[in-house]
């Protein structure tokens, strides 16, 4: 792959914690390169970065097209996938489908039309699904079975498939990288697994104790930053080499002893709490039942120095210090 120095960067999903950290790393690495961060959600503008402009806008075709036309981007970071834990409870499956799938389609089409040099799309390891016959360490060519049992993962799987198909179709015209990280955790990441790990209310399953992988938010932002220059077109898992059981992970993250119950009790218990304040989707209980561990060796071959600093255990320990 012929590396290049970016001249202008668009960050989509700027209200998210990962995008915020990535913007800081990019500003440090490329202090003279203009960056624009956009989001349809309200963005807390406390960055104090001279080369970053913040814009709140709806993800409509007209808004996107004007932005791409007016600004001469050569790198697009699509970090704006709407997760299942949203600050807006009105984001149901239909709205997520529109934002994640249709929004991604617009971004990719405009990137090709306006001759963007590189696009990085943030996906997730959830696309593989947590099933009893999963391989020990899933590689990038493993089937995407995440939505087999849970329709709420449909948008995640379809977005990944669409981005991957588009990537190979246009590989001679534009560099595209699809990242499938393991569980991202950190003080600025408000996702499903963080809610589960830090909840003192939801117990661990007595009858299951699968292995998990965790990556610290700073490390994931560093992977994204370094991928701009170093990682060629392709789909890549992003994960630590170490694993840790869900019981031990929850004990570390909550900084307190845990109690366990049979899974058939844990699930209904969480559903009842979801109606009040917890908002943990049902699919997470397959992930605390069956392991979904990924192999992240492929992306490491493209880095002179591995951008992941913290182990899974260290990432969990850092979560308790914040």
Per-segment meaning from a language model:
Residues 2, 298-300, 306-322:
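Amphipathic terminal alpha-helices
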Residues 148-177:
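Active-site Tyr-X1-5-Lys
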Residues 155-158, 189-193, 205-228, 233-234:
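Substrate-positioning beta->alpha
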Residues 57-102, 110, 130:
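NAD(P)H-binding glycine-rich loop region in Rossmannoid oxidoreductase-like domains
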Residues 4, 8-29:
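N-terminal Rossmann NAD(P)H-binding glycine-rich loop of SDR-like oxidoreductase domains
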Residues 217, 245-251, 272-306:
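Conserved C-terminal active-site "lid" loop/helix of NAD(P)H-dependent oxidoreductases
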